[in-house]
Amino acid sequence: MSSSRTDRATVAAWASWDWGSAAFNAVMVTFIYSVYLTESVGADIGGSIPASSWYGWAMAAAGVIIALVAPVQGRRADAKGRRRWSMTMWTLVVVALMASLFFIDNEPAFFWPGIVVMAVAAVAFEFAEVSYFAMLRQVSTPDTVGRVSGIGWSAGYFGGIFLLLICYVGFIAGEGGAFGLSTDDGMNVRVVALVAAAWYLLFALPTFFRVPEIEPDATVDSSYADSYRRLFGELRQLWREDPRSIKFLVAQAVFRDGLAGVFTFGAILAVTVYGLSPADVLLFGIAANVVSALGALAAGFLDDSIGPRPVILWSLGLMVVTSIALLFVDGPGWFWPLGLVLCLFVGPAQSAARSYLARIAPEGREGQMFGLYVTTGRAVSWMAPAAFAALVAIFGTDRAGIGGIALVLVAGMILFALVPKKPASPAPTPRGK
C-alpha cells in the first residue's frame, strides 16, 4: 500500500485535524481558557509577580522543551515509520489534558496545576503538529501542495470561528451563555474545556484512520543521543548541499514571529489604542479568523500557480504597509477595516511558508525538517514581544508597539528575499505499508 494518497477524501481527512486543532489554539490558548486562568483563577495568587507573568514563564518553559526536542521527535517518527502513530498519540495526550482542565476551579490554589497542564499540553500539541505538517507531501502532489496547505490552514481558521461562536453563545455571553451555567466557580469556562477536547478528538479521527502510515527507515537511531548526533551531522550535510533550506528556516522563523505578534498583541491594541470593548474584541477575533481563512484558501491556489515565494513576499509587504497605516489612525472605525486587511494576509503567509518547506524537504526527512521549522520558530519567538515592548517603553504609548511588529515583519521579509528563488519540487514520497 502506498504511503501517499492524494484523493479529495484523504485531503479532507488530513485538513480535518487542522479544523479540530483550533479547539486548542483559539479556545484554550488565545481567547477563552488562558484568560480564565490568568484573570480569574490567578487573580489573587499573591506576591509581586502577576498571574499573566507566571503563565508566560510556563509557556516559555514549554517553548524551550519544544525547541530542543521537536526536530529529533519528528526525525524518529519518520525513521520508525510511525508518523501517523506519533501524531495520533500526541493528539490524544492533548485531548486528555484539555479535558482535565475542567477540574481547575476558580480558586488561587488551582492556578499552579492549571498553568502546568497548559504548558504540557502546548508541548504535546507541537509534537503532534510536527508529524501532521510532515504529512503534507503524503496528501498532495507537486502541483497541488500549495492549495492543499491552504485548505488546511483555512480549515483551522474556520474551525476556530465555529467553535468560538458555539462557546460564546452557549457558555460565555451574558451570565453563563444560553445554557445559563454558573460563572462564580468558572463552571461555564470549565465546560468549554470539555467541549473543546471533544471537538478536537472528533475532527482528528478522520486523520487517524485515513492518512496512510509511512515506510520505516532501516537506519533507526537506537537512542535519543544517537538521534541528536545524526541530526547535527545531517544539518552540516544539508548546509553543504542545500544552504537554501537553512536560510529559509531562519527567514520563516523571523517573519512567522511577526505574524504571531499580530494576533498576540492585536486584542491589547484594539482595547488600549482604538477603543474597542472586550465584547467587540471577541467579535473582531471571529471576523479576523474569517478573513485569514479566506486569504489562506485563495493563496493556496496562487501558490500552485506562481509559487510560494511571491505569495509570501506580497503578503508580508502588504502587512507592513497596513501596519504603518494603523500607526496614524484612531478609533474603531479605522481599526476594523485596517485590522481585517492585516489579518487577510496572515493566512497566505503561513500557508505558503508550510508549502515552501514541503517542496524543499529531502525525501523521507519531512518530519525532521518540520521539527526544525518548529524549533527555529521557537528560537526567535522573543523577537516580536521584545520589539513591541521596547518601542512601547521608548515612546510611552502602546501605539508604538505596532511599529515593533512591523519591524519584525520587515526583517523576515528581507531575510526571505535573500533565499534563492525557486524551491525544488518534492521527490516522490517513499512507498509504505
Label every model-predicted segment.
Residues 2-12, 212-250:
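Juxtamembrane intracellular "pre-TM" segments in multi-pass secondary transporters
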Residues 28-52, 264-281:
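Short amphipathic helix-loop junctions that connect adjacent transmembrane helices
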Residues 66-82, 295-308, 392:
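Helix-to-loop junctions at the C-terminal end of transmembrane segments
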Residues 102-116, 327-339:
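Helix-loop junctions at membrane interfaces in 12-TM secondary transporters
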Residues 127-140, 348-361:
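Intracellular juxtamembrane helix-capping segments at the cytosolic ends
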